[in-house]
């Protein structure tokens, strides 16, 4: 049984804000300078990343690393920036007219709405590639053979979970099935890849760079899968029940696009119940891991109850 030392919500929220501010500074330090003939692409990239967001993926990465080492290893920081760039690139492409056709993102005009559809495509591409350039900087932070291997493995995880067997694979099935009925097994597949894969990457990279044993990495991946699924179901719930001002994006976007979601298949009540079950199972997984990171436990709990 863990001792609750951060049960006070105000303490947690202050801590969360401080950690997100630090992450924003770290991400900022890797963003390109807006100069040269191609400065428009730099502006569009930076606009997309600076639009805000919860910074969940870098947060998960550093907190899982902290679980195994008690601190955030320097090699983790470039990966934290990289995963947020990849996540942002997926949002930039998601909003395009040929995809979800959304004009708003994170409370501002979406990237294509601000810079044009052509720049929206290029900015998404640029962020995804630049992310790997940034991640590779982690090699400069380590010198031991084992640590160098870990950085190599982390890059492999990042690529696999972003690409055809991960996020892009999930988006492919999502696009192909949009506008028509989607069977539950395919919806689970889409969620596991489209949302789950990057959350798995963030936690797994944190574990690998934190020197976690193989069996612990498996638990981390299982934990991340549950958090990812719960997160996406909550997203579906908020699309039905949420307030556009709070969400910072168009509520009812799923209905507008006639999208099958967890809520349309299972109903609102069952969806809410499943989110609670998944989060409880995720906390169980977390409790199997060494170390104690109560902040991470609170973060998982609060995410499930989020309103945006």
Q: What are these model-derived regions, one by one?
A:
Residues 1-5:
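Short, Lys/Arg-enriched N-terminal segments with co-localized hydrophobic residues
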Residues 6-14, 27:
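Charged, compositionally biased N-terminal leader segments and the immediate start
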Residues 18, 22-286, 294-304:
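Mg2+-dependent prenyl diphosphate-binding active-site environment of isoprenoid biosynthetic enzymes
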Residues 289:
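Short arginine-rich
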